Amino acid sequence: KTQKGKFPIKSDIHATVKAIQDTGINVHANYMFGFQDDTIETMQQTLDLALDLNTEFVQMRYVNVLPGAPMYNDFTEDQLPKDWNAYSQYSYEAQPLDTKYISGKEVLKFRDHAFQTYFRSQKYLDLVKNKFGKKCYDHMLIQPKVPLKRKLLEEQKVA
């Protein structure tokens, strides 16, 4: 069964990331939102960890269940996206699955919030400026200002 990763002792992951960074290696971390047991609170814990670790590169994604994946059979056909565009993380049609506790819409909204929060955090921007220079820093000031358009997050217009 696929589940959210858990580190037995919080300091282990912190010490590991620091040890890697201390050797001059840039860390690329991947964070997933929308596991079946996720709530807004558990996703916030994941974001808090990301902000605390402050790695050089991150991906913030929602859980996607593709045909052939072990988790795919845990869902009924009506729970899965009907169109391949819905599987694309950054597409207008992106459609995360509901968790046991929150809707796919809430997962997508949180994922996009997490992305904006991380890349706008001063701690991260300082890391970029100090490690990669002003040109990269200036780019990072612009990049998160372009929000993704999401069909699922558009307000429904009342006739």
Predicted regions and their residues:
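C-terminal non-catalytic accessory extensions
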Residues: D138-A159
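A structural motif corresponding to the C-terminal lobe/cap of the Radical SAM core domain
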Residues: K1-K135, V158
